[in-house]
C-alpha cells in the first residue's frame, strides 16, 4: 500500500542528498524516515529496501564528490 505523500517526501529527501554539505547526518536522518515509514505501514518492506538502496547510492556519490573537491 503506497502512500503518495510519504513516497514523495522520501523521493525529495533522497534527491536533496545530491547537494548535501553534511551527507553523513543527512543520510542518518533520511534512513530514519524510511524506517519510520515502513514501521507505521506507509511503505512495505520491498519499497523500504528500494529507498535504502537509492539513498546509499546518492550518499556514496555525494561523499565521493566532496572527497574529490576537498583533496
Task: Name these PLM-found stretches.
Residues 28-66:
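Short, charge-rich amphipathic interface segments used for partner binding and complex assembly
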Residues 67-71:
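Short acidic DE-rich linear segments
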Amino acid at each position: 500500500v503506497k502512500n503518495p505523500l510519504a513516497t514523495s517526501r522520501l523521493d525529495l529527501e533522497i534527491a536533496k542528498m545530491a547537494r548535501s554539505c553534511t551527507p553523513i547526518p543527512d543520510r542518518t536522518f533520511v534512513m530514519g524516515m524510511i524506517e519510520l515509514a515502513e514501521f507505521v505501514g506507509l511503505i512495505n518492506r520491498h519499497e523500504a529496501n528500494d529507498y535504502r538502496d537509492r539513498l546509499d547510492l546518492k550518499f556514496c556519490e555525494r561523499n565521493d564528490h566532496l572527497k574529490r573537491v576537498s583533496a
